[in-house]
């Protein structure tokens, strides 16, 4: 990100003229405003709020993705876009602060979304194991299945606790970046473990 090629030329009136193309812009097809990173005078990495109504702002071709289809993803093309000084986000040369903060919130949201996926997998496992019968009884009565579901419960609520703790840290503005990173990593690992466990409960029918 710090190697951004989009150029922002400072003007005498304090405004900036931006030229470049930004890839993979979330909601690029319909958003009214974008956060764009550019190098002022080719050197100082800075963040700007770009409004769709600015002359020279165009959206590129929609990306066709395997997942996250509810979000429009397009390039945003900037051709001699004049941006007023008030649309500078933070300070010139301090855009990395904005960029890394965005990543922290993204990691937190990843942890929260995996928590929902895990709860869904847990519910499906409990339902299926109660419905499927082998040897005259539900497979939920078998020790191996009980162990798997119990392990899923423990992991799921460990994720939930970490997500709520991270939310509290963000609300308190304590800047615990390491906790946010840890939440995303642990949640991703635990979700993988839980999704693997549901396969062991449901067998090939899950596929």
Regions found by a protein language model. Give the residues of each.
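Glycine-rich beta->alpha junctions and the first turn(s) of the following alpha-helix
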Residues: 58-160, 197
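Short glycine/proline-enriched turns and hinge-like loops at secondary-structure junctions
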Residues: 1-2, 27-31, 69-71, 91
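A structural signal for short hydrophobic beta-strand segments in well-ordered beta-sheet cores
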Residues: 6-9
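Extended amphipathic alpha-helical scaffold segments
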Residues: 20, 125-129, 163-170
């Amino acid at each position: 990100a710090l190697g951004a090629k989009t150029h922002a030329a400072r003007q005498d009136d304090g405004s900036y003229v931006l030229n470049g193309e930004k890839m993979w812009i979330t909601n690029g097809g319909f958003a009214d405003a974008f956060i764009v990173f550019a190098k002022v005078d080719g050197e100082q990495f800075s963040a700007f709020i770009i409004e769709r109504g600015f002359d020279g702002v165009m959206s590129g071709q929609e990306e066709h993705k395997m997942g996250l289809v509810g979000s429009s993803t397009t390039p945003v093309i900037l051709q001699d876009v004049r941006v007023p000084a008030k649309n500078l986000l933070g300070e010139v040369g301090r855009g990395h602060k904005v960029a890394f903060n965005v990543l922290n919130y993204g990691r937190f949201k990843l942890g929260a979304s995996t928590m929902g996926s895990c709860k869904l997998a847990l519910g499906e496992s409990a339902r299926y194991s109660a419905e499927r019968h082998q040897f005259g009884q539900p497979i939920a009565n078998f020790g191996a299945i009980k162990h798997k579901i119990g392990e899923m419960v423990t992991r799921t609520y460990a994720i939930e606790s970490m997500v709520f703790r991270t939310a509290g840290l963000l609300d308190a503005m304590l800047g615990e970046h390491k906790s946010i990173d840890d939440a995303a990593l642990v949640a991703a690992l635990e979700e993988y473990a839980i999704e693997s466990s549901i396969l062991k409960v449901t067998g090939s029918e899950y596929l």
